[in-house]
């Protein structure tokens, strides 16, 4: 069982908020989902059979973990303050002086500056060297960043080294940093430099989930649902998917809706499933739009409403989710009904930021 796919973050573009990383895209694999299901039954919201990809937290200056070194407290660190204000050359000068004086957080900040290329030429080997110094001092955030650099690599400039990545991620995972726990689960899943042990993978994802990491919650739910038989637990899978759904993660909302609809790990509740599909559809997810359209077309979880079904499927179809039965339903509408569906689709389009135009049947 492979855990579901993640977006690979660009480290250059991700320097605004520490700990904020790429969620599963709201339309994961939507473009490839053009086949029409044979029977009405909400399916998986996206293909969970891909491979976990690197998730990077490199989004601002480093924050020292509670059990990490705290030289002079980072709040009063002038280099950190300059970085946050966008004064990168000032931050570089201050951090260099402080790093030479042995301040660990400044070594990590230098790594961030050289890795991101903010205000200076990007230099990944130099970034790695500063991270290594800070990690040796005991900074788990530096260990995380160094581990992610070795995990992804950068061609000839910095070769990927999964073994070194695992070593550093283990240091960061010991401080319960969710990105480290998540990516360490990746390495165990791959089974090359660390054993593919379902119990270890489950434990790492559980620890990441318990920190409040919603992506890990979804991954854990998928793993408990579809992973190796020895660790499967439908009820716990539904629990974690539901928790991620309630925190706003769109793919989790679709997964949880599917579980509610089918009664897997939870008491069947088609009406509640419809509510979750609608939440995800309102955020622009085409898979959810299609599932909601089916619900309206078949009267399961909501009263039959061919106008709503046609309007929602219009938007799903525009994003590549084709459904021959729903398309046939739309074509069977009277001219008046098509006009109503067009008006409703326009209302939905405003809500989700699209500009639909349905042409009435001639």
Q: How would you describe each model-predicted region?
A:
Residues 113, 134, 149, 172, ...:
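TPR/TPR-like alpha-solenoid repeats
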Residues 85-90, 121-130, 157-168, 194-204, ...:
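Structural signature of tandem alpha-helical TPR/SEL1-like repeats
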Residues 10-20:
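Bacterial N-terminal signal peptides
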Residues 96, 125, 132, 170, ...:
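Alpha-solenoid helical repeat scaffolds
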Residues 68-75, 86-87, 100-104, 116-118, ...:
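Short helix-capping/linker turns of helical repeat alpha-solenoids
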Residues 38, 51, 56, 63, ...:
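Terminal, low-structured helical/coil segments at or just beyond the last alpha-helical repeat
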Residues 75-81, 109-116, 147-154, 183-190, ...:
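Hydrophobic face of amphipathic alpha-helices that form TPR/SEL1-like repeat modules
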Residues 23-108, 354-362:
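N-terminal leader/linker segments that initiate helical-solenoid repeat arrays
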């Amino acid at each position: 069982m492979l855990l579901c796919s993640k977006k690979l973050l660009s480290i250059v573009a991700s320097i605004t908020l520490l700990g904020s990383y790429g969620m599963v895209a709201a339309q994961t694999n939507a473009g490839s989902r053009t086949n029409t299901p044979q029977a009405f039954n909400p399916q998986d919201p996206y293909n969970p059979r891909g491979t976990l990809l690197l998730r990077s937290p490199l989004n601002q200056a480093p924050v020292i973990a509670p059990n990490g070194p705290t030289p002079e407290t980072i709040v009063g660190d002038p280099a950190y303050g300059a970085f946050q204000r966008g004064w990168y050359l000032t931050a570089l000068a201050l951090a260099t002086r402080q790093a030479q004086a042995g301040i660990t957080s400044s070594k990590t900040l230098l790594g961030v500056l050289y890795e991101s290329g903010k205000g200076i030429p990007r230099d990944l080997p130099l970034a790695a060297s500063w991270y290594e110094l800070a990690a040796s001092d005991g900074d788990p955030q530096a260990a995380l960043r160094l581990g992610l650099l070795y995990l992804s690599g950068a061609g000839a400039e910095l070769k990927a080294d999964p073994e070194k990545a695992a070593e550093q991620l283990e240091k960061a995972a010991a401080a319960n940093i969710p990105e480290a726990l998540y990516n360490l689960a990746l390495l165990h899943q791959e089974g090359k430099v660390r054993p593919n042990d379902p119990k270890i993978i489950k434990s790492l994802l559980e620890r990441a989930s318990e920190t409040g990491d919603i992506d890990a919650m979804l991954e854990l739910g998928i793993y408990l649902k579809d992973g190796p038989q020895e660790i499967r637990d439908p009820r716990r899978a539904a629990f974690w998917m539901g928790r991620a759904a309630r925190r706003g993660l769109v793919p989790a909302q679709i997964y949880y809706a599917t579980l509610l609809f089918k009664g897997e790990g939870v008491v069947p509740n088609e009406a509640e499933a419809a509510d979750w599909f609608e939440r995800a559809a309102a955020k622009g997810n085409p898979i959810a739009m299609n599932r909601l359209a089916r619900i309206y077309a078949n009267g399961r979880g909501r009263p039959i409403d061919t106008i709503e079904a046609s309007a929602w499927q219009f938007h799903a179809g525009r994003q590549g989710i084709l459904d021959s039965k729903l398309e046939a339903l739309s074509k069977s509408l009277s001219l008046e009904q098509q006009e109503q569906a067009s008006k409703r689709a326009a209302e939905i389009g405003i809500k989700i930021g699209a500009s639909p135009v349905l042409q009435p049947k001639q």
